[in-house]
Amino acid sequence: MNISIISIGKLKEKYLKQGIAEYLKRLSAYAKVEVIELPDEKAPENLSEAEMLIVKEKEGIRILDKISDDTHVIALAIEGKQKSSEEFAVSLDRLATYGKSKVAFVIGGSLGLSSEVMKRSNESLSFSKMTLPHQLMRLVLLEQVYRSFRINRGEPYHK
């Protein structure tokens, strides 16, 4: 399976970079995983609704440029479906079973994802009803993908 994590914004925190590097190393035994960092759109603090839409659309174009037609796209969004680790593992296993060898997880910028990215997505996933920093979500997502492979192979992993 080829997994892409497409994320808006540059990761700056060293501890997050280290955690991500560790999970990428662990995942290399199970799948080809790449993290694609795309620049965020510079925007002032107090944006109007129209300006927010423009920012999301510009970021959305960058995201969609990185997704091929045969890729199964999972958008990370607060309004997405919440799953347990076991349910997430089953859904990843099903994708592999049904020949979906390319999977892209999409993490938007601070304003979220554009409507075009959401339309292109095959499903939407939420890790919490809470708002979490998109940089942190990369690490949490990689950990859950790793956990899914361990679950699907019946390998031990701490709970």
Curated annotation (Swiss-Prot):
<keyword id="KW-0949">S-adenosyl-L-methionine</keyword>
<comment type="function">
    <text>Specifically methylates the pseudouridine at position 1915 (m3Psi1915) in 23S rRNA.</text>
</comment>
<dbReference type="Pfam" id="PF02590">
    <property type="entry name" value="SPOUT_MTase"/>
</dbReference>
<protein>
    <recommendedName>
        <fullName>Ribosomal RNA large subunit methyltransferase H</fullName>
        <ecNumber>2.1.1.177</ecNumber>
    </recommendedName>
</protein>
<dbReference type="InterPro" id="IPR029028">
    <property type="entry name" value="Alpha/beta_knot_MTases"/>
</dbReference>
<keyword id="KW-0963">Cytoplasm</keyword>
<dbReference type="InterPro" id="IPR029026">
    <property type="entry name" value="tRNA_m1G_MTases_N"/>
</dbReference>
<comment type="subunit">
    <text>Homodimer.</text>
</comment>
<keyword id="KW-0808">Transferase</keyword>
<keyword id="KW-0489">Methyltransferase</keyword>
<comment type="similarity">
    <text>Belongs to the RNA methyltransferase RlmH family.</text>
</comment>
<dbReference type="InterPro" id="IPR003742">
    <property type="entry name" value="RlmH-like"/>
</dbReference>
<feature type="binding site">
    <location>
        <begin position="127"/>
        <end position="132"/>
    </location>
    <ligand>
        <name>S-adenosyl-L-methionine</name>
    </ligand>
</feature>
<feature type="binding site">
    <location>
        <position position="108"/>
    </location>
    <ligand>
        <name>S-adenosyl-L-methionine</name>
    </ligand>
</feature>
<dbReference type="GO" id="GO:0005737">
    <property type="term" value="C:cytoplasm"/>
</dbReference>
<keyword id="KW-0698">rRNA processing</keyword>
<feature type="binding site">
    <location>
        <position position="76"/>
    </location>
    <ligand>
        <name>S-adenosyl-L-methionine</name>
    </ligand>
</feature>
<dbReference type="GO" id="GO:0070038">
    <property type="term" value="F:rRNA (pseudouridine-N3-)-methyltransferase activity"/>
</dbReference>
